[in-house]
Amino acid sequence: MQEIKSPDGFIPLDIFVSSIGKERHTDKVEGMPGEVNYGTSYTSRDVELTMWFNAKDTIDYRLLRDELYAYFDSYDYLYVIETNKPTRALKIVIDNSFRDKRITTRVGEITINARTVDNPFWVSLYTTKELNDTGYDALVEKYGLVDSINSDNTKYKFTERNFSIWNAGNVTIEPETMYLKITATGTNGVLEIRNKTTGDTFKVSAEFGGDLVIDGMNTKLNGVNVFRDTNKRYTRLVSGKNEFEIIGQFTDITIDFRFYYK
């Protein structure tokens, strides 16, 4: 995520974020009263951005207004961060038109209605690899008190066969739609990764060895796609502690992901 400064003359005021919307899935069965409930799936959040702008004169006011319109039209999506919660971001899109509200000849206010895209969750700006490499104290110094991190569980790179990792978010990490990268070095091409907490097991049995990288739904061994040599299953990470067992030859294994929050 790259920080993008707002145009000169504009002062961001606030961000208002709704709860996550849900879509309920039901079906009607002939001869039965009511509907069959199949549960819900998350949709998106509504996000409202407010800002002021202060121009030099009435001509400059119009130029600033047009500059802001062009600014928000230049990006397909943006990440927004609350100043008082600087560790997490929301990915948003702005599809609806908006207009300024003129307060004086030089001062105006704009309210922009946006919504989340890809997933509706707050996501940590840092990854667990950064937490592992820099340590908890360095992360606190950079971001402040952060995100339910367990100070006793900040290790995400292991040489042991049995270990546990901590998902500080309150959302289960799903590799289909969220960032999760597992790297195992020094394998002989045959490896089994078990998350004993979720019951998920990933297996690969290739004809050559090397460094194994499972990046979301992509599996490569020494840069070669080996998806067909796997059991085509992936590992989720529930909120809190996840107990792992590794079976097979490896040098070290790193579990890199971001924390997600409702």
Could you describe each region identified by the protein language model?
Residues M1-S44, A89-D100:
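Solvent-exposed edge beta-strands and adjacent loop segments
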Residues K28-G31, I59-D66, T177:
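Charged, amphipathic alpha-helical segments
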Residues G34-I59, R106-P120, N242:
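Oligomerization/assembly interface segments of phage tail-like spikes and tubes
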Residues S41-Y79, R88:
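Compositionally biased, low-complexity regions
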Residues M51-A55, F98, T116-P120, G186-N188, ...:
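Beta-strand elements of well-folded, non-transmembrane domains
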Residues Y77-W122:
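Short beta-strand and beta-hairpin "edge-sheet" elements
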Residues W122-E130:
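Short, charged, solvent-exposed linker or helix-capping segments at domain edges/interfaces
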Residues K129-K262:
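Intrinsically disordered, low-complexity segments enriched in serine, threonine, and glycine
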